[in-house]
Structure formats: C-alpha cells, structure tokens
Amino acid sequence: MAKRGMLIVLSGPSGVGKGTVRKEIFSQPGNKFHYSVSMTTREMRPGEVNGKDYYFVSKEEFEQEIAAGQMLEYAQYVDNYYGTPLKYVNEMLDSGKDVFLEIEVKGAMQVREKAPDGLFIFLTPPDLMELRQRIINRGTDDIDTINKRMKKAVDEIEMMQNYDYAVVNDEVEKAAEKIKTIIRAERWRVKRFLPDYRKQLGELN
C-alpha cells in the first residue's frame, strides 16, 4: 500500500497573489504536486479556464454539493462561494500523491479541523497598502468591493497564528522558493517520519 501523500494548504488574503505563486511553483521542472482545483460561483475572469483555474458552477449546484457532503471545505466570500471538492483530494492522498490546495483563509481553517496533519502556509503581502494596490491593479472590482476585500484582509491576517508557516510575497519567484523549502523540510519532521518506522517495527514483531 502506498504511503499516504501530504496535504499542502496555501492561503492568505484576497489579492496577495496565491494563484500567481502557486502557478510559479507548478511551472518549475520536476514539480510533482497535484493541484486540487477549487469550485466557485464567481464569474470567470479573462484568461481563466474552467476545470483548470476553478470549476465554475451556479449557486444552486454548489449548494447541492454542500448538502451531499461532498466539500472538504467551503466559504462564502464577497457574495460568492468557494470550496474544495472532497473526492479528488482523498483519491490523490490515498494513492501517495501530495495534494496542493490554494484556498481562502476561512476554508483553510475548516481543513485544519478535518486534516490536522496537513501543512498550512500563510501567504502575506509586504504591507496593506501594497495589498490594496494589487487588488486595484487587477481591474476586476469596483471601489465598494475593494473596500470589502480590504476589511476582510485585515481580519484574515489576524488568523495567521493558526498556520504552521508564513511567507511574505514581495517577489513571486522568492516566495515560491521559500514555500518549496518549507515543504522539503516538513517531509523530514519526526511526526511525518515516525509512523512508517513504527509500521515496519510492527511488521517485524
């Protein structure tokens, strides 16, 4: 039976660059992470691809998935649902593959409760003014939505204490490399290393 894979959760406030950093990690040679595509009810942005960036569904479809217990986590953010389908994540982990989630902070806290052995990384901006400018530069939100996102961001940064590691996204390439370094180190933590040895010892007895 394959050793169970590691669940890696990257989250942070809206506009911090989670998607950009995740894409940088996945674009590098030798990448073996499996990206769990999130589901959302928000409208597709220019350049996004259904099934690659997100699964874009209606509110009714999303709520049906919730009712059926098919979401690992979900949250409602600025009037839209975001969440992670459960089936794919479990299939990948059980087959020994490492699964990479890029999700909202509220959703990450739900995953923390259900999968406490996951690796939780908080991506943070250099400062709040930089975060506001990044949201404005996206050109997808009106001023009211930008203000909502900033208020939410302040609350989310306070939740950083619930994560294992924090990475400042001042430069995408540097942030991606820091995250890869964290993951490499995490593999050798005793709590991840010891279960396999105990299993081997049990087989000898």
From Swiss-Prot:
Residues 5-184 form the Guanylate kinase-like domain. It holds the Pfam family Guanylate_kin. CDD domains: GMPK (cd00071). Transmembrane segments: none annotated. InterPro entries: GK/Ca_channel_bsu (IPR008145), Guanylate_kin-like_dom (IPR008144), Guanylate_kinase (IPR017665), Guanylate_kinase_CS (IPR020590), P-loop_NTPase (IPR027417). The keyword Nucleotide-binding applies. Belongs to the guanylate kinase family. This is Guanylate kinase. It catalyses: GMP + ATP = GDP + ADP. SMART domains: GuKc (SM00072). Its main location: cytoplasm. GO terms for molecular function: ATP binding; guanylate kinase activity. It is an enzyme of class 2 (transferase). ATP binds at residues 12-19. Essential for recycling GMP and indirectly, cGMP. Its EC number is 2.7.4.8. GO terms for cellular component: cytosol. PROSITE patterns: GUANYLATE_KINASE_1, GUANYLATE_KINASE_2. It is found in: Cytoplasm. Keywords: ATP-binding, Cytoplasm, Kinase, Nucleotide-binding, Transferase.
